A protein has these predicted regions:
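Charged catalytic cores and adjacent phosphate/nucleic-acid-binding surfaces used
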Residues: 1-11, 20, 74, 97, ...
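Short, amphipathic alpha-helical segments
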Residues: 10, 21-32, 57
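Flexible, glycine/proline-enriched loop segments at strand-loop-helix junctions
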Residues: 17-26, 51-53, 89-90
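Conserved acidic, metal-coordinating active-site core of Asp-based
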Residues: 53-118
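Conserved phosphoryl-transfer catalytic core
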Residues: 25-50
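Alpha-helix initiation and N-capping motif
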Residues: 13, 31, 47, 60-61, ...
Length: 209
């Protein structure tokens, strides 16, 4: 599950900083282990070189690009489906954190918490169960408009948001060359998120939990 944080209003970000520092440390450890596993499996990669080319934190895409450069695969998708597949035993998945803990941390800094593209991660029958648990922690909104949603997905998300008294959000999930089929803002061509969504999110009152 992906939780988006927007519109932080407090000046004390200590809990956010502490959480992110811990996550960065865990990610660095898993990245080093992945590089070690790749090299032991015969896929020559240089982790220092991967880090130098990455803007920000290193993720699976950066490893895929290194494998492309070294001639093992031709595309990032091929890497995800083969060498870097979670089923092959080489890839080291990130250590998951509780969505509820993330929501609490966002609220500690006066932020607005949004469940991103829920129908990508959850089945329709699972979403109400999650929202029932997440709402008391301070979840503010869900993404009802998303690049890969069809009309039925959007209508279902709208009805769920209204049922649980949540604000609505939307996003293209643009990731540059990593998702070439998605354009910034317009998604796959038919996405038009109302500006009113952003205004309501920014104006929302943050409740302490």
């Amino acid at each position: 599950l992906h939780i988006v944080a927007l519109f932080f209003k407090n000046t004390d970000y200590s809990q956010v900083d502490e959480f992110l520092a811990g996550q960065r440390k865990k990610k660095e450890e898993s990245n080093k282990l992945l590089a070690e596993r790749l090299n032991k499996s015969g896929y020559n990669v240089n982790y220092d070189e991967i880090k130098s080319k990455a803007r920000g934190s290193v993720n699976r895409v950066h490893f895929a690009k290194e494998l492309i450069k070294n001639g093992y695969i031709k595309t990032v998708k091929e890497g995800f489906d083969t060498i870097l597949s979670e089923n092959l035993g080489i890839y080291v998945p990130s250590q998951k954190v509780s969505s509820f803990d993330v929501i609490k941390i966002i609220k500690s800094a006066g932020g607005v918490s949004i469940l991103a593209h829920p129908l990508i991660s959850l089945e329709k029958e699972e979403l109400p169960v999650f929202l029932t648990e997440a709402k008391p922690y301070g979840l503010d909104a869900i993404e009802t408009m998303y690049s890969k949603y069809n009309e039925g997905d959007r209508e279902f998300s709208d009805s769920i948001a209204e049922e649980f008294g949540l604000l609505k959000s939307g996003g293209s999930d643009f990731h540059g060359e990593n998702k070439p089929e998605i354009s910034l803002g317009s998604g796959c061509g038919d996405l038009a998120v109302p500006y009113d969504f952003a205004k309501k999110l920014e104006a929302s009152k943050n409740i302490e939990y």
